[in-house]
Each structure stands twice: as structure tokens, then as C-alpha cells.
Amino acid sequence: MGESKGGAAVNSMFYAPSAKGLFRSCVSLSGVAQNPYSFAPSVNISTPSKKLAELVECPTEPSESFVECMRNVDFRRLVQLESQVYPNDIEKPTTGTLWAPTIEPKSSPSPYLTIDPKTAPFKPSYPWLNILNAADGGAYVAYIFGEPDLEYLLAENPKLVLPILLSLDLEFCANDIPEIVNRILAFYFGDLPVGRSTESQLVNLFSDYFFFTGVENASLNYGGEVSVYRYTYIQSVTFNSLRGDGSLKAAPTHSDVLLSFFPDPKDFPNRTYTEKDVEVSKLMVEALVSFIEDGNPTKFHPLNGAQVT
């Protein structure tokens, strides 16, 4: 079980030789290997990795020395140096890291992944549960609203800023990006401005791109039983209050589903619960435990009791 990149890690482990036979059922919360940032094709990661090695004074050749040196560098430093490896004229909010698993040669000692999860020749068959927050992409939008300069630039020149925020250069050829951005703007915004007045459209865009499309593709390409649920309940607290300037209205946003499983006193030390909060938490915990025990997701039903198919 994992959330966000942890959910993507769960999904990628389906294809990891070292994890074969270790699972009975799997749970991914807002994260699959098909999401951007969750898997890094080697063609995209070789040059940035060597640049990172130079920044931490590791040799880039031979590869054995490169790997041995990099393994001894504190992971915090590797993440902190990312902005120097992927520089942009526009500094985007730090909502995650671009470093992700990539394909390793089968000859490597204990390789994690030897095939691309997106094009794997076999289909795993573990019972798999996916849960998405209705406004998962709100996490990105909240950070944008918390950076006045970035918010202004996005409103003034979305064709310049959106490709950077979405890191389209990691997924598409540079020549195709202008047309892709035009289609994005036409589909989500039409003739409307891009900014606070179109918060819901921004949230839909970032939700679709970073979360929903990946889950849809992963589910359609899955070989076993897979269930996908959209979490819509808003607890009395939300991670929106901790992101950006705290003004984002869309919810439940990224990670909010965790608030129905865990109290999280670190982030919400004064949290209180309504009767409905408790009711939903009990439902979610019981349904999750049931799925973990027997792989049956049927206890995840809407609170109104409607049948889910």
C-alpha cells in the first residue's frame, strides 16, 4: 500500500523481479507508475544523472564508480540539487521530485525494474485497489496561488508557463509542445482566463494530467481485478490549509483521503471530528481492511448506499 509516489511504487513493484510473489493484494492511493514523474525512461534520465553526479563530485565514468559514489550521497542533497539539474527561467513550486525508477539492465545486481511498466509484455493479476481524491491536482494549484509572481506569469502568458509547470519536455518532443498547449487551453479554458477565476478548470487540468489519466491507462492495461474509486468526502480538516496561501477551495485534494485513515496529529494538532467524519473513517478503514484480507473491494460503497459496479 502506498500514497502518491508510494502508490506508484506499489504499481511498479508488480513488474520488479525482486518483488515477485511477495504480495497478495495491493492498494495505490493517487499514484500509479503511468503518472508523470513516477517512472523515468532511461533516455530521459541519463544526461541529468551525469549532471547531478558532477554537482556532488562523483565520477560519471565508469558506470560502476558512478553508481557506487552516488549511493553514498545523502538523498536529501540529491533532491535539493534538482533545480540545478533541471533549470528553468521560471521557478515552479516544489511538489515532488523528478527522480524516479528507471529501467536497469538484467545483468545488474538485484535490478529493480528491467521493463517499462507502460509497455510490459505481461499483465500482473494481483487484486488491485486504486483510490483518487476528487481534486487531486489541487495540490499543484494551491502552490501556484501561493507564489504571486508565478500566478501572475501564468495568467499573463499561459503558453509559456504551463509547459514548465507540467514538465511537458519530459513527455513530448519540443516541436509538439506548442500545439499540445493550445489544445490544453482550448479544452479546459476556452476563451476564459487562466487563474483564480478559473480555479476549478486549473484543478481539473492538473488532476487529469498528473493523476487521473495515468490511473485510467494503468487500469485498462491491467490483467487482474482492479477497482478504482473516487474519494469525495471532505473531512473537517484538509491539506489545502497547509499549501500555498491556504485559499484553495477545491477539495478533497491530494492526500486528503489519508485523513479518513489516519489522525495525523503532526499536521493537524487541534483536529476535531464531526459524527460524519467518524462515520466515513470507520467505513474507509473497515473497507480497506476487508480488501487487504481477501482482495474484495465491495465494502467501498458510497455513503448513500448506492450499488457500485
Language-model region placement:
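Serine-hydrolase-like catalytic core of hydrolytic proteins
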Residues: M1-V67, N72, D89, I103-K106, ...
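Short, solvent-exposed turn/loop segments enriched in Gly/Ser/Thr/Pro and often Arg
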Residues: S4-K5, Y229-V237, L303-T309
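Sec/Tat-exported extracytoplasmic proteins
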Residues: P17, V56, D74, L192, ...
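Substrate-gating cap/lid region and adjacent catalytic-acid/histidine neighborhood
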Residues: Q34, C69, R76-V278, A287, ...
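Glycine-rich, phosphate-binding/catalytic loops in enzymes
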Residues: N44-I45, F145-D149, F300
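Surface-exposed helix-capping loop/turn segments at secondary-structure junctions
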Residues: P59-S63, Y222-S227, S290-V308
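C-terminal catalytic lobe of FAD-dependent flavoproteins
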Residues: M284
